[in-house]
């Protein structure tokens, strides 16, 4: 039996929902992690979903991580995949989820994966200056990780579609992401209705309120005056050294609203409204 260390706070938000800001804030006051063991655990999650990795072994992975780091705040962006099990396994922890509207979230995911594709394609043009082996390993993992959210989410295809100004090419993966957002938040709302004291939802537009809530949980002096720092995404060294602007042809929700399946849009709007009503 593995000994268990329970963090004070576990974040259940999807990626692109302020988790980097939460980590930057928390690390000022306590031991905080954000992407620790990210590739290893997400690959284990992929194998688990394929029936190639036992759930107990996957959950033990979390136990080992917490024992090794003795972390107080875990804002890892893969926690949400197993949140029901984490709620049960770490019953002494507090859980939070930052809510972002579904269309904005889908576009942000596409923009991020497109940016990743741009980075790698840029590096390939000057392969002498960069560690291409490390970059290939990283982008291979990124694209495996992307399939957890949408089977068609691939950095290169997203980037090329962005550059061609063809939103229609991205509609299938957008709808896959939207379906994921709906399914996850349905599960979350169901869990909150049965365990209302374990998960607190915060709107992404009110991260300062979240900062004050975290301040209370972490016993930080003057918690009622705390604010959340602006998010600044970190990339691996071999990637961050590539001087590529994020200014690809950015996608916006309005690009997809008139094309997306209307029933899917209505369901997403309903779930978002229900989740907003649960916001702290």
Question: For the regions a protein language model found, what residue spans apply to each?
Answer:
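Glycine-rich phosphate-binding loop used to anchor ATP phosphates in small-molecule kinases
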Residues: 66-83, 98
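Short aromatic-enriched loop/helix-cap "lid" or pocket-rim segments at secondary-structure transitions
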Residues: 24, 44-48, 86, 107-112, ...
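Short catalytic-loop micro-motif centered on adjacent basic/acidic residues
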Residues: 11, 71-74, 200-202
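PAPS-dependent sulfotransferases, especially Golgi type II membrane carbohydrate sulfotransferases
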Residues: 1-8, 148-280
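Catalytic phosphate/metal-binding cores of nucleic-acid and nucleotide-processing enzymes, i.e., regions
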Residues: 114-117, 123-126, 131-142, 179-182
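Conserved phosphate-donor/acceptor-positioning beta-strand/loop module used by diverse small-molecule
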Residues: 89-111, 205
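PAPS/PAP-binding and catalytic site of the sulfotransferase fold
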Residues: 18-30, 87, 108-110, 199-222
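PAPS-dependent sulfotransferase catalytic core
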Residues: 1-70, 233-238, 250, 280
């Amino acid at each position: 039996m593995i000994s268990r260390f329970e963090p004070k706070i576990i974040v259940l938000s999807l990626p692109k929902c302020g988790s980097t800001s939460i980590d930057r804030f928390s690390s000022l006051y306590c031991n905080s992690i954000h992407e620790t063991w990210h590739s290893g655990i997400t690959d284990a999650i992929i194998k688990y979903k394929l029936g190639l990795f036992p759930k107990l072994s996957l959950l033990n992975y979390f136990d080992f991580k917490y024992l090794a780091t003795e972390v107080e705040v875990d804002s890892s962006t893969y926690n949400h995949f197993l949140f029901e099990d984490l709620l049960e396994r770490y019953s002494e922890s507090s859980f939070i989820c930052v809510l972002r509207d579904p269309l904005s979230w889908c576009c942000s995911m596409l923009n991020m994966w497109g940016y990743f594709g741009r980075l790698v394609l840029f590096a390939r043009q000057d392969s002498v200056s960069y560690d291409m082996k490390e970059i290939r390993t990283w982008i291979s993992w990124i694209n495996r990780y992307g399939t957890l959210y949408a089977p068609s989410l691939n950095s290169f295809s997203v980037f090329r579609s962005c550059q061609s100004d063809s939103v229609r090419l991205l509609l299938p993966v957008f709808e896959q992401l939207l379906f994921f957002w709906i399914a996850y938040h349905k599960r979350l709302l169901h869990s909150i209705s049965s365990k209302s004291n374990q998960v607190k939802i915060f709107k992404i537009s009110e991260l300062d309120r979240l900062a004050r809530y975290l301040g209370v949980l972490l016993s930080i002096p003057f918690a009622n005056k705390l604010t959340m720092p602006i998010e600044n995404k970190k990339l691996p060294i071999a990637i961050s050294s590539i001087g590529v602007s994020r200014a690809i042809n950015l996608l916006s929700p309005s690009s997809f609203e008139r094309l997306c399946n209307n029933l899917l849009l209505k369901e997403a709007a309903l779930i978002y409204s229900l989740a907003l009503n649960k916001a702290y």
